[in-house]
Amino acid sequence: MKQQIQLRRREVDETADLPAELPPLLRRLYASRGVRSAQELERSVKGMLPWQQLSGVEKAVEILYNAFREGTRIIVVGDFDADGATSTALSVLAMRSLGCSNIDYLVPNRFEDGYGLSPEVVDQAHARGAQLIVTVDNGISSHAGVEHARSLGIPVIVTDHHLPGDTLPAAEAIINPNLRDCNFPSKSLAGVGVAFYLMLALRTFLRDQGWFDERNIAIPNLAELLDLVALGTVADVVPLDANNRILTWQGMSRIRAGKCRPGIKALLEVANRDAQKLAASDLGFALGPRLNAAGRLDDMSVGVALLLCDNIGEARVLANELDALNQTRKEIEQGMQIEALTLCEKLERSRDTLPGGLAMYHPEWHQGVVGILASRIKERFHRPVIAFAPAGDGTLKGSGRSIQGLHMRDALERLDTLYPGMMLKFGGHAMAAGLSLEEDKFKLFQQRFGELVTEWLDPSLLQGEVVSDGPLSPAEMTMEVAQLLRDAGPWGQMFPEPLFDGHFRLLQQRLVGERHLKVMVEPVGGGPLLDGIAFNVDTALWPDNGVREVQLAYKLDINEFRGNRSLQIIIDNIWPI
């Protein structure tokens, strides 16, 4: 199946009230991304939403305060992705700095324990002497685990950002901006953001109770942990709304200034990234995957240990271990992609077209990599995808990724209502979800999922498209504008990096590496000569020496090599004219 990609230009909100002193290009870019006022461009900590609007915080901090006073053993239970790892490390570091000495953490193993606070994970925490469990980036659907903890006399504080179901676990306190009765304006906090807000509230409560004065403890500067917040927020691909942009920008600023955890510094080194020139995309595409590799292939306790360690030498050893795991992950993923594309071809041949929603399974797929695989196939065919791998007990674990127009968790909830028992469990967000089912139910699920997507999704949404910010004038194709755009972020999910389009003469073209197209182009109407590169092109189509003019969708970029800086364009899409 050849996915046709259409170009659409982003609409600009002409009613946005943005500062007149902003360059016209930035005003256009911000207005087309839903920014309506200067307040939404605030990047200082003063602009952060107050923690007081998070429901459940007051009860949670009282429980934690009493635990601190009584020396209660606290176990932080995290998750096996980058958000879970940063949430766990942040919570442990923050509570230690606040004066808690009896604290430990536990991260479930993806392959042995599965996701969340299960009864088995509670037993592990109990074996470690847990007297209070605090979940981070999980717990909102852990009814059985919370009940089991209560039966053992262990209270639970749930901090999470995943969407809640119709009923909530019977925890002593629940903090989640997506609770129905929570008035926190941002529903897009990552798990690490929720954990950070709880620690801010706890610090205030402890200060008001005289905790620090009684013990002659300096009140900690929790802003020192914003590097972890930035990494977890970007890596979890939550929308970068105004509040998340503040958290991310502040964390990135600390990393750029060299004021970050040794583990983050070591990850930057193995990823060959310059901290001083850090972009949000480096967190998402360089650091995040290496941290995630621990949870995907091995055990995320390695990742948490990296983020907790204070010694750069130890951090470098752990970062190299994660880098090697990430390389293995890439190799596994490459093989799985080939198999997935073969499955798509067979499916298309059997019915002349691909279904609106793809559910895929291969008995040799790796359950730690199916989420990435679903993302890759979704990007290729522009439709919701759920990829499954065997869980080893007659069940399958699936990871889904969606497109705009289909809320993945809502779709799974509807399937669960229509076909009770088809799935064992599920959870997630609008754009990503996880589920498990018995292996003999896969064919039924594949059929029902495809039917539901066809029913719910407008067929036009299955047409892949590139959304552009329109053309740049030749005068805007400069290093100064490229730097302006770099500094105008952070860019990310739901606040995309500026992408422009234009008509160019194709002056030179050649392959570099195996699949990257290096070009030199010139605007058809006149303008500067531009070096450009398009990654992972279809080598059956490019290079094509018969093509003289092209339409490009591209990003302005600064190429830095051996101390030299030059303007280049990163080409997302290229169409011959």
From Swiss-Prot:
Keywords of the record: Exonuclease, Hydrolase, Nuclease
GO molecular function: nucleic acid binding; single-stranded DNA 5'-3' DNA exonuclease activity
Keyword Lipid metabolism appears in the UniProt entry: no
SUPFAM superfamilies from the UniProt entry: DHH phosphoesterases
Keyword Hydrolase carried by entry: yes
Domain of life: Bacteria
Enzyme class at the top of the EC tree: hydrolase
Entries under InterPro entries matching the protein: DDH_dom, DHH_sf, DHHA1_dom, RecJ, RecJ_OB, SSDNA_exonuclease_RecJ
E.C. code: 3.1.-.-
Listed Pfam families: DHH, DHHA1, RecJ_OB
GO BP, one annotated term: response to X-ray
Entry function: Single-stranded-DNA-specific exonuclease. Required for many types of recombinational events, although the stringency of the requirement for RecJ appears to vary with the type of recombinational event monitored and the other recombination gene products which are available.
Similarity section: Belongs to the RecJ family.
Matching PANTHER family: SINGLE-STRANDED-DNA-SPECIFIC EXONUCLEASE RECJ
Cross-referenced NCBIfam families: PRK11070.1, recJ
Protein name: Single-stranded-DNA-specific exonuclease RecJ
